[in-house]
Amino acid sequence: MDAPARLLAPLLLLCAQQLRGTRAMNDIGDYVGSNLEISWLPNLDGLIAGYARNFRPGIGGPPVNVALALEVASIDHISEANMEYTMTVFLHQSWRDSRLSYNHTNETLGLDSRFVDKLWLPDTFIVNAKSAWFHDVTVENKLIRLQPDGVILYSIRITSTVACDMDLAKYPMDEQECMLDLESYGYSSEDIVYYWSESQEHIHGLDKLQLAQFTITSYRFTTELMNFKSAGQFPRLSLHFHLRRNRGVYIIQSYMPSVLLVAMSWVSFWISQAAVPARVSLGITTVLTMTTLMVSARSSLPRASAIKALDVYFWICYVFVFAALVEYAFAHFNADYRKKQKAKVKVSRPRAEMDVRNAIVLFSLSAAGVTQELAISRRQRRVPGNLMGSYRSVGVETGETKKEGAARSGGQGGIRARLRPIDADTIDIYARAVFPAAFAAVNVIYWAAYAM
């Protein structure tokens, strides 16, 4: 019994060592993502032992040089109302930490994202971000690679909503410049120095992006040193990218409907003046539709004090639509005024003819030798009062009455000639040519001022 017991003890010890080795292999497999030889692996526990992650590499010495690089995955949304855009990027940071160097091999070690919590990391943040979050499906989207000389590559995937100041004076024919500013939150230029990676000549993925409302025309990188009186100088890296708005969708949704509404208001110039309900309803409908179009277009824009190019065009169209309605009111007023004048002429013409006939009879009697007293007595007895006035006005005119009558007729005739109403049909004929020509001229000036 003693001999089997002595053999069983070493066997159990061997099994325990084998199990421990298997677990160690599994743990290493969590850190190494490839089929590599295990013999070259550094002793991670030895590297981490005594490692102070709260202090930067080389504390008390020269600053840490951190290289940054960006890859743009998508630009999801650009909002003019909130002056912001949403971007998903891969942020790559690289620096050297001599405390983690292992020079007995030339292999780069790929580590699990859980190892990140044991390392010192630059406190990089997005200066103009309104909100941001990391991705964690199916695991945390973080990458860490360790080179033998202690150089660390740290990559994370971030989605951030970033502020972008926009000048909308030429909207929707505007071009905007948005920025992504990266800076250290707590380390000044004495502790950390940022610079764009040498491989960052262009941004991978940005050239292939297809945006709904914009086209990315160009981008550039800048480096500057921000000076804060209370905290010192902080290095800042900025990505500037220029956006040109796609005008096609606005021409279809805003400009073409406005032009069609203006052209629709001109239809009233070909409708008869007698069709009052048709012309009035057409004019009011175009005015209200233009108002609705203006309100709906402004709903997606900020309430800014600047007048935008689209607002200018809407008001141009609104003035032409309203002017077409006013044109009909003016033409209808002239037509109604002419009708009243004709009615007055028809009523006064028979009365004037009767006065002339009575005056001729009285003049004939006077020429035949009838005495003035007899003529006066007969006129007083037989001739009505209006005939007396007519006779005096025709037959007994002195020089003064002629002069006064000529002066009155000359003054009133000149005013009436200047204020004589124009025929309504003539107004419509002029409007058919003047309105389209004026609208075309205004369009040429507008597009030359804003589009070129």
UniProtKB/Swiss-Prot annotation:
InterPro entries: GABAA/Glycine_rcpt, GABAAd_rcpt, Neur_chan_lig-bd, Neur_chan_lig-bd_sf, Neur_channel, Neuro-gated_channel_TM_sf, Neuro_actylchol_rec, Neurotrans-gated_channel_TM. Residues 25-251, 299-308, 450-452 are extracellular. Its main location: membrane. Disulfide bonds join 164-178. GABAARs subunits share a common topological structure: a peptide sequence made up of a long extracellular N-terminal, four transmembrane domains, intracellular or cytoplasmic domain located between the third and the fourth transmembrane domains. Heteropentamer, formed by a combination of alpha (GABRA1-6), beta (GABRB1-3), gamma (GABRG1-3), delta (GABRD), epsilon (GABRE), rho (GABRR1-3), pi (GABRP) and theta (GABRQ) chains, each subunit exhibiting distinct physiological and pharmacological properties. GO terms for biological process: chloride transmembrane transport; gamma-aminobutyric acid signaling pathway; signal transduction; synaptic transmission, GABAergic. Delta subunit of the heteropentameric ligand-gated chloride channel gated by gamma-aminobutyric acid (GABA), a major inhibitory neurotransmitter in the brain. GABA-gated chloride channels, also named GABA(A) receptors (GABAAR), consist of five subunits arranged around a central pore and contain GABA active binding site(s) located at the alpha and beta subunit interface(s). When activated by GABA, GABAARs selectively allow the flow of chloride anions across the cell membrane down their electrochemical gradient. It is a multi-pass membrane protein. One of its GO terms (cellular component) is GABA-A receptor complex. The keyword Protease does not apply. Glycans are attached at residues 103, 106. Pfam families: Neur_chan_LBD (PF02931), Neur_chan_memb (PF02932). Belongs to the ligand-gated ion channel (TC 1.A.9) family. Gamma-aminobutyric acid receptor (TC 1.A.9.5) subfamily. GABRD sub-subfamily. This is Gamma-aminobutyric acid receptor subunit delta. The modification Phosphoserine is found at residue 390. Changing residue 220 to C: In GEFSP5; uncertain significance; does not affect receptor current amplitudes. It catalyses: chloride(in) = chloride(out). Changing residue 370 to I: Found in a patient with childhood onset epileptic encephalopathy; uncertain significance. It comes from Homo sapiens (Human). Residues 272-275, 332-426 are cytoplasmic. Gene3D superfamilies: Neurotransmitter-gated ion-channel ligand-binding domain, Neurotransmitter-gated ion-channel transmembrane domain. The keyword Glycoprotein applies. Residues 1-24 form the signal peptide.
